[in-house]
């Protein structure tokens, strides 16, 4: 929707004669609905269709695009499932463009992590890998306006100290703002996803009957953020990084003192609290509350993959809710890839548990919407992956080491076949990352792996035309063999250094090939 400068009211955009509403080509290779969804998706992500714009009425679109209602509705459902559209019902409703944010990705990944028995200790390790370096980088890039924003966010923390949900929301906003200032979109997305999950555990700790412990945690956060602001004002990146590391260490120790560090995370209390405070909006509050309840039951293991829900009639009676509101709640879960709906009340619905591949799809959409380049993605890889590899080497098991030896031999056999080499390399990475024995770090590696899989066809197609690519493959295989040797000695420092060296070599490859400056959106197609 567009905004009227006189009234501030939201008005739907109108179909014009431009390319936005051109009729769809008729091709036999793909369904027209999928072509339309892909076309609109590209226009949303490139800004041709802006956030909060309302698409023209269904009748206008079908006429303009020369398609059926069923085809249009299927295309819009695809975009809704990708969090790029919101379908509003009732008078004044319609399809409204959305800018995908971190909320949906965070919620999905949190559910995935809880089902993998992730603990608070695992999340602490994730933060220690990602955040301190980003905090130091942020200080070097922060201007006066940025510092004022951080001060305002810090003031919000102070004012919300006695409100557990408000306080957790405020500290999450401050921490995310610091990471955003580091200037790497990929890092900001990944850190933001896991920070929201960590915040859920902080909420559980401070929203308790132990008022003294809750007050200690709140005060420690406020003092730590004040110290970081002092370092930022001095433009001291080293001090800022140390301050952030101390912040993570001290707050984590307070939580450890309450003997929760090794317990599996439980995100359900925060979800229920957030749903209970949902305001008025296009989605009924009862629908949001019910969707949160189903989400929580999946997280708690009460609903498992493939479980069938009761009929609409039985569910409506169980929750004392109207069928339209119930259907809206189920649609929310369907759009989050947590439910398979069937036509008709008797068909029921079945539960889908989350996967890292779907999480990567959701994260990829957010990266695309932010205009992330492949160079940005690769810089995040250079910062995150060596520490993970170092931890994996220090925790390697004989079985995993044997798998690494085998895949190293396969890499040596296919250095002249770039397409096969890249595919084998991705498999080798997954074996290495799985050795870290931290489900949260493994999920990060898997998400980045699946994003790379998305751009792999474009990378492979161009790489095969470069005359020196076989030499690059041989060098990568040599370094991987050195990593395996370091892992055999459980040499975490050596393994991390070898991995960093390999990534540095790849960085020059991307610069030479021109991939670095291309958008993730364009590479993923």
What are these regions (language model features)?
Residues 336, 437-438, 450, 466-470:
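Intrinsically disordered, low-complexity segments enriched in Gly and acidic/Ser/Thr residues
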Residues 23, 70-73, 77, 81-84, ...:
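Extended, hydrophobic interaction surfaces within ordered domains
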Residues 11-15, 201-282, 301, 454-525:
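C-terminal all-alpha effector/ligand-binding and dimerization domain
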Residues 1-125, 264-380, 524-525:
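Short linear motifs at protein or domain termini
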Residues 127-133, 137-207, 242-252, 377, ...:
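Conserved amphipathic alpha-helical segments that form helical-bundle/coiled-coil interaction surfaces
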Residues 41, 45, 135-139, 151-158, ...:
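Regular secondary-structure segments
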């Amino acid at each position: 929707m567009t905004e009227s400068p006189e009234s501030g009211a939201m008005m739907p955009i109108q179909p014009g004669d431009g390319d936005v509403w051109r009729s769809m080509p008729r091709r036999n290779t793909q369904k027209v609905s999928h072509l339309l969804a892909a076309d609109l998706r590209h226009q949303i992500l490139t800004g041709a269709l802006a956030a909060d714009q309302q698409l023209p009425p269904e009748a206008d679109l079908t006429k303009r695009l020369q398609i059926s209602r069923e085809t249009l509705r299927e295309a819009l459902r695809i975009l809704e499932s990708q969090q790029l559209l919101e379908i509003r019902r009732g008078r004044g409703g319609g399809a409204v463009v959305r800018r995908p944010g971190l909320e949906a990705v965070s919620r999905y990944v949190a559910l995935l992590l809880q089902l993998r028995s992730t603990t608070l200790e695992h999340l602490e390790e994730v933060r220690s890998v990602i955040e301190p370096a980003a905090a130091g980088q942020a200080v070097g890039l922060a201007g006066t306006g940025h510092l004022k924003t951080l001060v305002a966010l810090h003031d919000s923390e102070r004012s919300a100290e006695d409100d557990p949900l408000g306080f957790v929301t405020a500290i999450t906003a401050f921490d995310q703002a610091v990471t955003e200032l580091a200037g790497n979109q990929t890092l900001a997305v990944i850190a933001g996803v896991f920070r929201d999950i960590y915040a859920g555990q902080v909420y559980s700790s401070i929203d308790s009957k132990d008022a003294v412990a809750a007050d200690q945690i709140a005060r420690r956060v406020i003092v730590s953020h004040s110290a970081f602001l002092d370092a930022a004002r001095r433009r001291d990146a080293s001090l800022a990084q140390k301050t952030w590391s101390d912040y993570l260490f001290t707050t984590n120790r307070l939580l450890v003192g309450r003997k929760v560090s090794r317990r599996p995370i439980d995100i359900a209390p925060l979800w229920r609290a957030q749903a209970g405070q949902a305001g008025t909006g296009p989605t009924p509050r009862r629908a949001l509350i019910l969707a949160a309840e189903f989400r929580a039951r999946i997280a708690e293991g009460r609903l498992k993959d493939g479980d069938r829900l009761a009929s609409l009639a039985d569910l409506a009676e169980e929750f004392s809710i109207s069928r339209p509101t119930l259907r809206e709640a189920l649609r929310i879960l369907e759009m989050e890839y947590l439910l398979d709906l069937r036509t008709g009340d008797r068909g029921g619905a079945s539960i889908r548990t989350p996967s890292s591949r779907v999480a990567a799809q959701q994260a990829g959409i957010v990266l695309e919407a932010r205009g992330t380049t492949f160079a940005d993605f690769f810089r995040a890889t250079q910062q995150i992956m060596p520490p993970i590899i170092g931890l994996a080497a220090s925790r390697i098991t004989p079985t995993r080491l044997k798998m690494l030896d085998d895949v190293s031999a396969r890499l040596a056999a296919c250095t002249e076949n770039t397409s096969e080499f890249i595919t084998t390399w991705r498999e080798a990475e997954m074996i290495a990352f799985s050795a870290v024995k931290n489900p949260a770090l493994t999920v990060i590696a898997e998400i980045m792996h699946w994003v790379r899989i998305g751009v792999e066809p474009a990378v492979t197609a161009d790489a095969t035309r470069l005359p020196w690519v076989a030499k690059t493959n041989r060098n990568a295989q040599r370094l991987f063999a050195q990593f395996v040797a370091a892992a055999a000695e459980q040499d975490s420092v050596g393994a991390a250094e070898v991995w960093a060296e390999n990534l540095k070599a790849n960085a020059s490859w991307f610069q030479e090939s021109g991939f670095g400056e291309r958008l993730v959106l364009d590479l993923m197609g």
